Swiss-Prot record:
Organism encoding this protein: Thermococcus gammatolerans (strain DSM 15229 / JCM 11827 / EJ3)
A single Gene Ontology CC term: cytosol
EC number in record: 1.1.1.26
A Gene Ontology molecular function term of the record: glyoxylate reductase (NADH) activity
Binding-site positions, NADP(+): 158-161, 180-182, 239-241, 288-290
Protein name, entry field: Glyoxylate reductase
Subcellular compartments: Cytoplasm
Reaction it catalyzes: glycolate + NAD(+) = glyoxylate + NADH + H(+)
Alphabetically ordered keywords of this record: Cytoplasm, NAD, Oxidoreductase
Family stated for the protein in its record: Belongs to the D-isomer specific 2-hydroxyacid dehydrogenase family. GyaR subfamily.
EC supergroup of this enzyme: oxidoreductase
Subunit field text: Homodimer.
């Protein structure tokens, strides 16, 4: 009899096809997030669970899932999973790093360039017919933006995605600064990147890109004090987690001109709507789509499947998050 896996949202078929060879597979069929009470019911007879960032996977879920042995999170981050509690119970937790690195770094640059050059404003101006109504074919002062080439970029969080952002910055001839919990000598050499304390990075950067995981230490690490350290011409890009930035402080910074603009792919709560923030012209907004390319999402689905299949075969999953769990229970559904 095959072990059973429940997938909380439809993922690309390549991953599901791989899983069907080894598991009894059930997929939540709706686009909306699975209701909490339904999730708690569905996990009662599953051996494995594929989850999204939007689901809170905690002790309550584990209490309702007596057979659960592994949680495969369809994301590189895993702040939605109580990893410590999972480890205590011998439940393996995996994620999907690497396969979404380039897509997410590309999107950081999409936000950076679009914000710097006021792309959404210009698109709206053109699409609405305002350009035609004004009757001005070209004007020296129309939609002036900020130069990118040769400027200074500060990257907060210098893991895979942060370094991928930096590689792209090299092509723009930029000075690259970074801040991280630990220094990265090899990356510094490869990318000609300079390690800076957070305050110095904020003061010196023309563009600040957030690429840190959400932890107790990074919660609201960018608040009023930090935003006031930035240049009034600087642009903030957040591809990390919404809670890394104090939203109320950011709104104030954008309205009062402490910084020039922001590009946001993540928010403190998701889905999200904030009329005050969303009415501002100097911010570009996206609904958490940093990894939303066909290649990245298919790669994530394949990695989810590889993790679960490895576990089923009694092997340590390739991208195991809680490595200490192997001391609690060996991999496998035995």
């Amino acid at each position: 009899m095959k072990p059973k896996v429940f997938i909380t949202r439809a993922i690309p078929e390549n991953g599901i096809d791989m899983l069907r060879e080894h598991f009894e597979v059930e997929v939540w069929p709706e686009e909306r997030e699975i209701p909490r009470e339904v999730l708690l019911e569905k996990v009662r007879d599953v051996d494995a669970l594929v989850t999204m960032l939007s689901e809170r996977i905690d002790g309550e879920v584990f209490d309702n899932a007596p057979r659960l042995r592994i949680v495969a999170n369809y994301a590189v981050g895993y702040d939605n999973v109580d990893v410590e509690e999972a480890t205590r119970r011998g439940i393996y937790v995996t994620n999907t790093p690497d396969v979404l690195t380039n897509a997410t770094a590309d999107f950081a640059w999409t936000l950076l360039l679009a914000t710097a050059r006021r792309l959404i404003e210009a698109d709206s101006f053109t699409r609405s017919g305002e350009w035609k109504r004004k009757g001005i074919a070209w004007h020296p002062l129309m939609f002036l933006g900020h130069d990118v080439y040769g400027k200074t970029i500060g990257i907060i969080g210098f893991g895979r995605i942060g370094q991928a952002v930096a590689r792209r910055a090299k092509g723009f001839g930029m000075r690259i600064l970074y801040y991280s919990r630990t220094r990265k000598p090899e990356a510094e050499e490869e990318l000609k990147a300079e390690f800076k304390p957070l305050e110095e990075l904020l003061k010196e950067s023309d563009f600040v890109v957030l690429a840190v995981p959400l932890t107790k230490e990074t919660y609201h690490m960018i608040g009023e004090r930090e935003l006031k350290l930035m240049k009034p011409t600087a642009i903030l890009v957040n591809i990390a987690r919404g809670k890394v930035v104090d939203t109320e402080a950011l709104i104030k910074a954008l309205k009062e001109g402490w910084i020039a603009g922001a590009g946001l792919d993540v928010f403190e709560e998701e889905p999200y709507y904030n009329e005050e923030l969303f009415s501002l012209k100097n911010v570009i907004l996206a609904p958490h789509i940093g990894s939303a390319t066909f290649g990245a999402r298919e790669g994530m689905a394949e990695l989810v499947a590889r993790n679960l299949i490895a576990f089923k075969n009694g092997e340590v999953p390739p991208t195991l998050v809680n490595k200490e769990v192997v001391k609690v229970k060996k991999p496998g559904f035995r």
